[in-house]
Amino acid sequence: MMVSFFDQFASPSYLGIPNIAVAIALPWVLYPTPPARWINNRLITIQGWFINRFTNQLMLPLNVGGHKWALLLASLMIFLITINMLGLLPYTFTPTTQLSLNMGFAVPLWLATVIIGMRNQPTIALGHLLPEGTPIPLIPVLIIIETISLLIRPLALGVRLTANLTAGHLLIQLIATAVFVLLPMMPTVAILTAAVLFLLTLLEVAVAMIQAYVFVLLLSLYLQENV
């Protein structure tokens, strides 16, 4: 029986009960917990260094009001990286290939940045809908365009993450299938294809980390406009 390449993106279930909640909760179990002593081990030290470095880089362009988001954005970044990396393992489900999950992250956080801007500085927040120096006849058109641009931001966040991960997984599966098909017929070509598969896997590892960083970075840029 021929298995569809898109079956890997179907949400797993056991006895009719969806297991996506288990897939989402699993990354938090894998993180090491700092021990109750003065000296940490190497893994805790590396984890702390990475979180501090990322948080400083992310919070640098924000003012003091935006620093309250440091814990949330850093946690989201680590969570997305872990899910994306675990999804590269064979026979594993990647929750971030589901648009519904990514939109569940993007919409509330984007809406929170908009609400903060409307509450703290409503004049500046509304001023983003109309570029400075716009000719009077173009004002209604530009307001509509900027409003649409504002509303599609969470959709762009979710679709970007979903599309990049889905495309990478499909390419890996297609090339891996080609290796198995070519191996008995043309071993030399199969070995070359396997080398391409290895390089593509390394590229997908980089994409998994970069897309998580881009997701959080864009949220911080939206926050920067409203704090």
UniProtKB/Swiss-Prot annotation:
One of its GO terms (cellular component) is mitochondrial inner membrane. It catalyses: H(+)(in) = H(+)(out). This is ATP synthase F(0) complex subunit a. NCBIfam families: ATP_synt_6_or_A. The gene is mt-atp6. It is a multi-pass membrane protein. Component of the ATP synthase complex composed at least of ATP5F1A/subunit alpha, ATP5F1B/subunit beta, ATP5MC1/subunit c (homooctomer), MT-ATP6/subunit a, MT-ATP8/subunit 8, ATP5ME/subunit e, ATP5MF/subunit f, ATP5MG/subunit g, ATP5MK/subunit k, ATP5MJ/subunit j, ATP5F1C/subunit gamma, ATP5F1D/subunit delta, ATP5F1E/subunit epsilon, ATP5PF/subunit F6, ATP5PB/subunit b, ATP5PD/subunit d, ATP5PO/subunit OSCP. Keywords: ATP synthesis, CF(0), Hydrogen ion transport, Ion transport, Membrane, Mitochondrion, Mitochondrion inner membrane, Transmembrane, Transmembrane helix, Transport. It comes from Cyprinus carpio (Common carp). The chain crosses the membrane at residues 9-29, 69-89, 98-118, 135-157, 179-199, 202-222. Belongs to the ATPase A chain family. Gene3D superfamilies: ATP synthase, F0 complex, subunit A. GO terms for biological process: proton motive force-driven ATP synthesis; proton transmembrane transport. Subunit a, of the mitochondrial membrane ATP synthase complex (F(1)F(0) ATP synthase or Complex V) that produces ATP from ADP in the presence of a proton gradient across the membrane which is generated by electron transport complexes of the respiratory chain. ATP synthase complex consist of a soluble F(1) head domain - the catalytic core - and a membrane F(1) domain - the membrane proton channel. These two domains are linked by a central stalk rotating inside the F(1) region and a stationary peripheral stalk. It is found in: Mitochondrion inner membrane. GO terms for molecular function: proton channel activity; proton-transporting ATP synthase activity, rotational mechanism. CDD domains: ATP-synt_Fo_a_6. It comes from the Eukaryota. Pfam families: ATP-synt_A. Its main location: mitochondrion.
